[in-house]
């Protein structure tokens, strides 16, 4: 078997998003820093895919407690894909490419600059999600909004995965 087919067979993942927030905010107009709408990614390994039709997120936890504002499901995850620009009514187009050779550390100045200028998530810049993707895995993209007045208007989203063949 050829080495490129066994070690890290995924080469690139490309996300295309057309979205915008509700179009108003108290501050941060046109920036990513003031945005409370974003997209998270999750790689679901093939062996962990649910078999039943019910995969919804419960409103209350196992103890009957409602999700509070600091609940992990209500905050950007470490795998934040992209934020919307804050207070922009028109549709914005985002093109995010992850490559298996990416190698930007989440705690680097370069990652901070990319997050500030492009709205990308810091932890997705190191290429690890691409290198760890296996045949059969599923990529989920979650559109999120944090507060009641904030809304994430998603017009289109696509995910393309490129493999070594």
Model-flagged regions — what are they?
Residues 50-135:
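Extended, solvent-exposed segments with strong compositional bias
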């Amino acid at each position: 078997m050829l080495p490129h087919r066994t070690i890290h067979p995924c080469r690139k993942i490309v996300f295309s998003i057309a979205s915008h927030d509700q179009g108003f905010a108290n501050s941060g107009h046109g920036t990513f820093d003031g945005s409370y709408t974003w997209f998270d990614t999750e790689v679901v390994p093939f062996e962990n895919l649910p078999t039943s039709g019910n995969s919804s997120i419960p409103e209350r936890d196992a103890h009957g407690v409602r999700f509070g504002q600091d609940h992990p499901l209500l905050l950007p995850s470490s795998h934040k894909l992209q934020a919307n620009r804050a207070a922009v009514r028109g549709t914005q187009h985002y093109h995010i490419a992850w490559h298996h050779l990416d190698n930007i550390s989440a705690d680097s100045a370069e990652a901070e600059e990319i997050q500030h200028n492009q709205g990308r998530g810091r932890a997705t810049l190191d290429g690890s999600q691409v290198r760890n993707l296996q045949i059969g895995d599923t990529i989920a993209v979650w559109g999120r909004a944090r507060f009641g007045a904030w809304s994430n208007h998603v017009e289109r989203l696509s995910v393309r995965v490129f493999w070594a063949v």
